[in-house]
Amino acid sequence: MTSETAYRTTSALKLILVWVGLLWVLEAVDYATGHALDPFGIAPRQADELLDIVPAAFLHFGWDHLMANTVPLLVLGFMAALRGVGTFLVVALITIVVSGLGVWITAPVPSNTAGASGLIFGLFGYLVVRGFVDRRIADVALGGVVVVLYGSILWGVLPTTPGVSWQGHLFGLIGGVMAAFMTSHARAKGEPKPTWH
């Protein structure tokens, strides 16, 4: 392992551990305050709720909700962050905003949506598509591993489970795919398409 690879690996691990740790701290605060943070979820088509799109991605409705999201976020987040901390943060922001806007526009009224699952679906989409966009064989292979490990989550974009925001999942996935193109190494205007490597 080269020093650069070791640095990227360590940075990715630190980032995702801090990110997930923050989710647990926020849930502890929510629990200790009688769920005072729950209103910061997304209430569809209310103008003042647009400001809650980002914080909603860091909040959960109970420990079971958070625990269900913790492992996939750790795994997919670490894989995505290996490309670089800056890239991960851009991908996360794009995904969270697209997912949140999708929920705000399409979710039923009344409802309240929060949780990291939109980001998880976004990271899934990003990791699967990224290798094809950048024509990197190693990333295509990584995307294949992601499909094997977490491909079954795609059922979550269908409206089959009451109380689960399929809208957040679907638009999170779309946001992740968008992020793969927007953060591509070949995104600069006039830059030739990358060759496979």
Tell me the role of every PLM-derived stretch.
Residues 2-197:
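A detector for small-residue-rich transmembrane helices and their helix-helix packing motifs
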